[in-house]
């Protein structure tokens, strides 16, 4: 909501959607993937709108890409089980279409009260790192920009990317 957006702005940070909109070519078309993921889920934990992550397919300098941005307004960008599923879908789209993928990282890591539900099978969190390696072997460019918090499991994405950028004063 608005108070959480204002809190991000007070820290000198953009929201996930603002970051993506700033990055993508303004005059080109883009589409958000899974905007309603997480709708009505995890209400006992305060909810997880959009799965806590924003995914868009759009163009950067005329090149079609997948952009994934943690939403720090949702539990400080922590990963819920649906967050992992949405990230996996973004990677799947990138692999199927051989599109570069850009991760805008601002995450407190796994949401600890639900960590037992994030790692249990091959279609969960650990699969993301397998996909990183697979995309690397396929020659699919992966770029990470650390925009804010980058701890625990969330720190592996930048390490496994082809390039990692750390934003001065807001990244940690």
What is each stretch, according to the model?
Residues 1-149, 153-156, 160-172:
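Terminal-region recognition feature
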């Amino acid at each position: 909501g608005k108070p959480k957006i204002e809190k991000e702005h007070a820290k000198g940070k953009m929201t996930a959607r603002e970051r993506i909109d700033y990055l993508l070519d303004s005059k080109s078309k883009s589409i958000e993937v899974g905007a309603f993921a997480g709708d009505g889920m995890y209400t006992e934990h305060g909810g997880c709108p959009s799965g806590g992550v924003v995914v868009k397919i759009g163009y950067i300098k005329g090149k079609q890409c997948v952009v994934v941005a943690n939403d720090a307004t949702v539990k400080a960008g922590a990963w819920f089980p649906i967050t992992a599923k949405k990230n996996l879908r973004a990677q799947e789209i990138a692999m199927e279409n051989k599109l570069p993928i850009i991760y805008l990282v601002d995450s407190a890591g796994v949401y600890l009260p639900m960590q037992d539900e994030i790692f249990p099978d091959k279609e969960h969190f650990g699969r993301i790192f397998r996909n990183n390696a697979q995309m690397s072997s396929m020659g699919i460019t992966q770029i990470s920009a650390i925009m804010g918090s980058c701890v625990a499991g969330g720190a592996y994405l930048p390490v496994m990317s082809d390039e990692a950028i750390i934003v001065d004063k807001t990244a940690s």
